């Protein structure tokens, strides 16, 4: 079982089925994630938890390529929002993105 924390909005979007792809840095911790694994997401603010199953794992050189491969809704944007790979720099430094690359985790909500 893998465990990850999420901000409230992406947590809500996964919970209601809107967000089906979680984006992370492809670092040492994420390299252990495989199709069929379970991930427990914890809401950073409320402590609520969601359980998901990993349905797909895709690695990209950067978030630019990842964003091109998925619909903006599936990665957590609303249809009226502009999806920008630069948004990921809120979470990861450009140096780390270049070093590790981007990881798209296709997920299915269990509970």
Predicted regions located by residue number:
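Short, solvent-exposed beta-strand-terminating loops
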Residues: 57-67
């Amino acid at each position: 079982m893998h465990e990850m924390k999420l901000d409230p909005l992406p947590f809500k979007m996964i919970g209601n089925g809107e967000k089906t792809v979680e984006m992370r840095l492809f670092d040492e911790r994420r390299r252990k994630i495989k199709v069929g694994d379970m991930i427990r997401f914890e809401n950073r603010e409320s402590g609520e938890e969601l359980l998901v199953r990993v349905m797909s794992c895709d690695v990209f050189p950067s978030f630019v390529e990842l964003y091109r491969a998925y619909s903006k809704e599936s990665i957590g944007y609303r249809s009226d929002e502009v999806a920008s790979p630069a948004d990921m720099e809120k979470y990861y430094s450009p140096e780390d993105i270049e070093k590790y690359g981007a990881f798209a985790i296709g997920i299915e909500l269990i509970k």
